[in-house]
Amino acid sequence: MANKKDFILDTAQKLFMEQGFDQTSISQILEATQIARGTLYYYFSSKEEIMDAIIERTIERAFTASQAFADNRGLTIIERLVGSMAALNLNHQEGEGVLLHLNQPQNALLHEKTNQILLERAPQILLPIIQDGITAGDMRTDYPYESLEMILTYSLQAFGSSFQALPPEKQQQKLQAFLYLLETIFHSRQGYFNPFLSLIQTQSS
């Protein structure tokens, strides 16, 4: 039964990405899946509920991938940190469809809920990396968890769709300011967080 539910989600997500959420109908999902209408409604009461489930699944996959980077002791501390944060990028996890839906004005509450989940769970994944950085002498802070919360909150706001609209020189200025912020909060050497440059630029492209 679970496999059929995932099949519906996979098929619907493909259609949403190809055609757009508003342009995709339940009838088209039924035609693509070749399942009975009653079967689909057994799992989902509406197209919106299907998208909610896709978003929830996307978030869970992002957390799983992020945790894998955090736990990989074969990587350097900064590689684990950058990899873990890159994995939390929902756009790269599932393509543009999910974020395009979240960014619609009518979905503001859903977007806020998604960000809240990220802000609640991501620091728990990233905290051991920061603690390893402190132990290694690469970072220093009395407030590692709170620092992560503030950095993640700022990142969600600063490097979203509004960042893409900035001219290149303004983007670079904001990126350099973010690196300065990281180095200041964690009392790290200059250049330590430079790998974040490519991460943010990739996420925002």
Predicted regions and their residues:
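Hydrophobic alpha-helical connector segments
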Residues: A53, Q67-V98, I151
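All-alpha amphipathic helical-bundle segments outside canonical DNA-binding/catalytic cores
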Residues: E79, T114-L118, Q131, T135-I151, ...
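Helix-turn-helix
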Residues: F7, L15-E49, A53-R57
